[in-house]
Amino acid sequence: MRYGMVIDLRRCVGCNACTVACKQSNGTPPGMFYSHVSLREEGAYPNATARYTPMLCGHCEEAACVSVCPTGASYRDEAGVVRVDHGKCIGCKYCIAACPYEVRTFLSERIEGYFPGSGLTEQERVMYGGFEVGKVYKCDFCRSKGYTDGIGPSCVRACPGDARVFGDLADPESEVARLLAAEQVRVLGEEYGTKPNVYYVARSGA
């Protein structure tokens, strides 16, 4: 089994539904995001174009974050998902420095919540209860939520344009494997040699 994702940029409208769904599902503190949509503007009026690129952990086969981790906290599980064992994480941030995609986050200070000065609400205390100061956090394809093997990652389910397809790349009959075989795809930062398992179908002319 090797989980992966194909993102069709022809279908992405930059709505950030994936960003919101990820944040809501994982209950991340203010300022912490496991995914986001990058916006790049090209050209000039009246021929300006907006290029949207959803960004998340690539769950690389040759993950730089895993190789530099001195404690084994960053690892690839049996399904090829790059994860963090927070019991082993010492907060050295080597993995953040090594990741060329800048998709890891570090909780550097006590969580203040969305209403500064008023303390955490009861809901926020529940949501943020699993986060520890001095630890690194990232996307795990919703493995920690138990969604991966069933309904799939929250970002995939939330996309109104069906731009994301998730599944087992090792299963030739899976939708994601068939899409990978049928479309011209690319990975971000191929020059880094990390072999991501998140692929992109480019827009026309991109």
Whereabouts are the PLM-identified features?
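Non-ligating segments of multi-cofactor redox enzymes
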Residues: M1-A206
